[in-house]
């Protein structure tokens, strides 16, 4: 295909000369980075697309499987595993011979011959292969370890239909009944073959067949019977990672003015690609595909195309050739991938949507709504790219982190500590329509947007952590982004049940309204504590309760079963909320066993982590221990999920009941033991208790003593509980500000020499729904109170800030609030939505579109509703509109400040702090437009005495002031003011150039999340105003 496409690859630039092609400029920071990469990467592999060639003959094939799917062919179901060998060869393994099955209890008195029954089923239902009778135990309820007979029904297809027939009583001589082990084909196969997500599989040499008539683009394509697979548990040498190829890409579109790009109309003009191998730090492919010419970029290839169609087809060829295992990017799932597919469709490129690993499978876009209690509801687009894993960093970060803003800019600033230039989509078209130099600028911008997701992937360890989560829970990697928490527990449950001959009932998920009491919170004794507060934490509280008391489906009793099995009180535990569970000597529960294995494996991973020296292996082990911890904690949540596969409120409510009891017991034990009557100099006091921790005031002033006592108290109280429940001493807060339940701040100490950090919970330093001023003020106030121990200084700072706010001295960037403009209908009018509508009426070209974040400030208007008072910050700057400072004081600052100062100063003094004499002076900017000003006729006045000037006087002064000799001083002041403003603007402009990575190019950035953007805009306006004033001085005759 490639020879027919008119493309040119620009020559690699001379790396020694650090100049652009026009010789005008030094390279930007980002280009220096590209240069470093080029010099660091081995020459022979740099910019090489192809995978390493295959050896002439194979022995055993071992590969790490990445993606798995089931497929149907001529009435049979099979599985496909895609993977990569240690040498970097791509593999497609077709697994044959496995037949899906489910269980159904054999009815009492079943006297039919099994062969007759099987023949009847085969004649009635399409797809039945065979039926066996086997002895199993149901997971639900203690059964005295007695197994009962079950039909094991094997079906090549139509398994859901057959299962429903048994459940609905459509099978001859069998009443409606519960069926067991309802799980999809792929997971059933993986569980039975002991394959976990991202694990290694070996295909023995004489067991697999090489497929010559290949359906995939993989280097090795083979078939094997499932019984011949060798699956390696992820431990020891099999914890390794294959050299996965990770492609990060970004596209740029040339949109029309005022319209967000639409694939039917707006072309894709550039695609930047960066490919890196997992475990390596430098990408070995860096290129940009462009429409039209483009000047060269250091250390990167440019592929120029005359037509967009040629560029897209060449990019598709690039994907097939470089053969990425993982495709990443930022918002690629909902924008970039669907956009290129829709654009190719609009251009009639029928051969384009085939860049997966299956040659004849077309890439198609589906809409999916993902909803879970943990992650909320999100609408996403899903594209099948068979054999290639997709990891959209935006979706990953939205799932794992709570941030103020999720733009790539904000996220990069938060995690990587660097900003990037943010070019508005309307400017992109101007750059594309300019010269090859402006297109080069766009290409550098696009390439950086492809680099950043790779940097985030490395920093946040997404691939490593998700790999370990797939290995620990057993599910395919793709499930981790597309499914909720439950599937992970189900997978572990089925694996353990298979070992123990236990089957799991297929219960209808009905979502009961039954509620159970949550965790205890000991009422906080609010206040400011200038003494050390020790924190005692239960290690893995809920998992350890389930293990200590053997809480499980398989150990659950009721009064009838206690009587039927002749159990005594020594045989079972009665939980605080009145449920019964048998002791582990009679039956060790499945859930406690799973938890025991997870926590033991975590201890081992943490021990290995301490010994490991290789940085990549350390990351893998850290990801593993994290995955094990998360998995252990999610088992409890699974039992309490009323809309779930296997809800059991007896387990979940017993866990929280034990938890409540233990927090109370800890409080009483500590206060009883560390008391004056027990020979201690102070009475210890538990000032707050949360789900799994208690805060203790021992009374001592010095940190070291409190740390020793904390350690001692944790060990002492642990002896009062059943194994493996353990109380641990982790930290001391000193000083500590306890505001309310789940709201506190303090300095966090783990060693007496120096505090580790300032720790806050539920306080506005971490809240996302307020302006930057609140965050900055609260952070500063806490620094003064906690780090400097200087409350009067904090009070002075607050008074000064409030005075500055009321007198219009706070920079506008501090007052900007941003919210996402989404398509959902809001029940009440929203400030940012109403503003977006007003902006559209003013200028459709610059108005926010769906998906954008709308930045606004609250201004003084005739209306009293906030949605009437929201305004675009740029419009406010241009027209000098007055800010509603009372809104910012009353609605944004007052409550957070009250929460901090009332525990310290009391209500009266806090009120004085927020409403004292420093709040009497209010200055408001005079608007330039609107209201009566529309009818006012503006006349020029003398800059000295404010006397109106005659029409023919275009100068700055009236004749009287000229006669009095005021000119020179006033002119000098005007010049020095101009000098100050130009200097300020120049500093801000340089800061923006430094951020964009070049000190010579014009600043195009319009990042509304960045405070400098508004400062720069205001400074530019101030310089312009002052220049107009100086023109008047030029026209003054003096």
Curated annotation (Swiss-Prot):
Where in the cell does this protein reside? Nucleus
Q: Which residues bind Zn(2+)?
A: 942, 945, 958, 961
Instruction: Enumerate the Gene Ontology biological process terms.
Output: base-excision repair, gap-filling; DNA replication proofreading; DNA replication, removal of RNA primer; double-strand break repair via nonhomologous end joining; nucleotide-excision repair, DNA gap filling; RNA-templated DNA biosynthetic process
Q: What is its main location?
A: nucleus
Organism equals Candida albicans
Subunit record text: Heterodimer with subunits of 125 kDa and 50 kDa. The 125 kDa subunit contains the polymerase active site and most likely the active site for the 3'-5' exonuclease activity.
Name of this chain's protein: DNA polymerase delta catalytic subunit
The entry's free-text remark on the cofactor is:
Binds 1 [4Fe-4S] cluster.
| Gene of this entry | POL3
């Amino acid at each position: 295909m490639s020879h027919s496409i008119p493309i040119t690859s620009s020559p690699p630039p001379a790396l020694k000369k650090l100049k652009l092609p026009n010789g005008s400029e030094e390279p930007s920071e980002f280009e220096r980075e590209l240069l470093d990469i080029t010099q660091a990467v081995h020459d022979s592999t740099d910019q090489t697309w192809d995978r390493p060639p295959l050896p002439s003959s194979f022995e055993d094939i071992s590969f790490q499987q990445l993606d798995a799917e089931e497929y149907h062919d001529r009435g049979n179901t099979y599985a496909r595993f895609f993977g990569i060998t240690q040498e970097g060869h791509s593999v497609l393994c077709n697994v044959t011979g496995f037949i899906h099955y489910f269980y159904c209890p054999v009815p009492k008195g079943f006297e039919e011959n099994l062969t007759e029954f099987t023949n009847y089923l085969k004649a009635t239902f399409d797809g039945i292969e065979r039926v066996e009778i086997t002895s199993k135990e149901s997971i639900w309820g203690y059964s005295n370890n007695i197994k009962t007979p079950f039909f094991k029904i094997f079906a090549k297809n139509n398994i859901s239909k057959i299962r429903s027939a048994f459940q609905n009583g459509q099978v001859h001589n069998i009443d409606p009944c519960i069926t067991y082990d309802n799980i999809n084909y792929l997971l059933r196969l993986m569980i039975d073959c002991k394959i976990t997500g991202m694990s290694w599989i070996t295909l023995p040499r004489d067991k697999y067949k090489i497929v010559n008539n290949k359906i995939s683009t993989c280097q090795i394509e083979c078939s094997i019977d499932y019984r011949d697979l060798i699956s390696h548990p992820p431990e020891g040498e099999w914890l390794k990672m294959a050299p996965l190829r990770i492609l990060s890409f970004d596209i740029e579109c040339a949109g029309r003015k005022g319209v967000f790009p639409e694939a039917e109309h707006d072309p894709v003009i550039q695609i930047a690609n960066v490919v890196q191998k997992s475990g390596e730090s430098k990408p070995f492919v860096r290129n940009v595909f462009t429409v039209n010419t483009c000047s060269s970029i250091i250390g990167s290839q440019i592929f120029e195309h005359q037509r967009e169609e040629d560029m897209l087809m060449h990019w598709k060829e690039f994907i097939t050739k470089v053969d990425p295992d993982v495709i990443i990017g930022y918002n690629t799932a909902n924008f970039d991938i669907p956009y290129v597919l829709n654009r190719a469709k609009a251009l009639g490129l029928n051969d384009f949507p085939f860049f997966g690993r299956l040659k004849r499978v077309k890439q198609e876009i589906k809409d999916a709504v993902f909803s879970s209690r943990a992650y909320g509801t999100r609408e996403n687009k899903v594209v099948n790219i068979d054999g290639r894993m997709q990891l959209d960093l935006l979706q990953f970060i939205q799932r794992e982190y709570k941030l103020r803003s999720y733009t790539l800019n904000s996220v990069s600033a938060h995690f990587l500590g660097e900003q990037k230039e943010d070019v508005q989509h309307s400017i992109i078209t101007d750059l594309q329509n300019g010269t090859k130099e402006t297109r080069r600028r766009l290409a550098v911008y696009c390439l950086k947007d492809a680099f950043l997701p790779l940097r985030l992937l490395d920093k946040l360890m997404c691939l490593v952590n998700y790999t370990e989560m797939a290995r620990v829970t057993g599910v395919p990697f793709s499930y981790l982004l597309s499914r909720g928490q439950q599937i992970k527990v189900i997978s572990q449950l089925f694996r353990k049940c298979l070992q123990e001959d236990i089957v799991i009932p297929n219960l209808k998920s009905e979502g009961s309204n039954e509620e159970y009491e949550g965790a205890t919170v000991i009422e906080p004794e609010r206040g400011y504590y200038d003494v050390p507060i020790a924190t005692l934490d239960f290690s893995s509280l809920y998992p350890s309760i389930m293990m200590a008391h053997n809480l499980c489906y398989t150990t659950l009793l009721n009064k009838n079963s206690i009587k039927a099995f002749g159990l005594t009180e020594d045989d079972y535990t009665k939980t605080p909320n009145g449920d019964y569970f048998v002791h582990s000597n009679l039956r060790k529960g499945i859930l406690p066993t799973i938890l025991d294995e997870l926590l033991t494996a975590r201890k081992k991973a943490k021990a290995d982590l301490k010994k490991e020296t290789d940085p990549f292996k350390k990351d893998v082990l850290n990801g593993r221990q994290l995955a094990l911890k998360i998995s252990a904690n999610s088992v409890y949540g699974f039992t309490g999920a009323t809309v779930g596969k296997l809800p059991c409120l007896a387990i979940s409510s017993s866990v929280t009941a034990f938890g409540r009891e233990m927090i109370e017991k800890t409080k009483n034990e500590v206060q009883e033991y560390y008391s004056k009557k027990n020979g201690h100099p102070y009475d210890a006091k538990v000032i707050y208790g949360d789900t799994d921790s208690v805060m203790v005031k021992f009374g001592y002033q010095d940190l070291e003593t409190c740390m020793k006592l904390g350690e001692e108290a944790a060990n002492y109280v642990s002896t009062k509980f059943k194994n493996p429940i353990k109380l641990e001493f982790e930290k001391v807060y000193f000083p500590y500000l306890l505001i309310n339940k789940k709201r506190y701040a303090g300095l966090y100490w783990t060693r007496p020499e120096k505090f580790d950090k300032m720790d806050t919970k539920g306080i506005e330093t971490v809240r996302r729904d307020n302006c930057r001023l609140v965050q900055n003020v609260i952070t500063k106030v806490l620094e003064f109170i906690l780090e400097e121990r200087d409350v009067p200084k904090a009070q002075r700072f607050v008074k000064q800030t409030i005075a500055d706010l009321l007198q219009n001295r706070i920079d506008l960037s501090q007052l900007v609030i941003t919210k996402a403009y989404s398509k959902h209908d809001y029940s009440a009018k929203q400030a940012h939505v109403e503003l977006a509508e007003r902006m559209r009426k003013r200028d459709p070209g610059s108005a926010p579109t769906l998906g954008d974040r709308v930045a606004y400030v609250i201004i003084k208007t005739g209306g009293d509703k906030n949605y009437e008072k929201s305004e675009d910050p740029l419009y406010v700057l241009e027209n000098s509109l007055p800010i509603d400072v009372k809104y910012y004081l009353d609605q944004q600052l007052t409550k957070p400040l009250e929460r901090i100062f009332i525990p310290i100063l009391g209500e009266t003094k806090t009120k004085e702090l927020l409403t004292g004499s420093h709040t009497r002076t209010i200055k408001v900017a005079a608007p330039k437009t609107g209201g009566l000003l529309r009818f006012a006729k503006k006349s020029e006045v003398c800059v000295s005495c404010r006397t109106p000037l005659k029409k023919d006087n275009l100068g700055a002064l009236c004749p009287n002031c000229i006669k009095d000799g005021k000119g020179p001083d006033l002119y000098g002041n005007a010049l020095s003011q101009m000098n100050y403003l130009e200097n300020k603007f120049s500093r801000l402009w340089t800061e923006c150039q430094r951020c964009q990575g070049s000190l010579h190019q014009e600043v195009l950035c319009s990042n509304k999340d960045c405070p400098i953007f508004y400062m720069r805009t205001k400074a530019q306006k101030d310089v312009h105003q002052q220049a107009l004033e100086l023109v008047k001085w030029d026209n003054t005759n003096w």
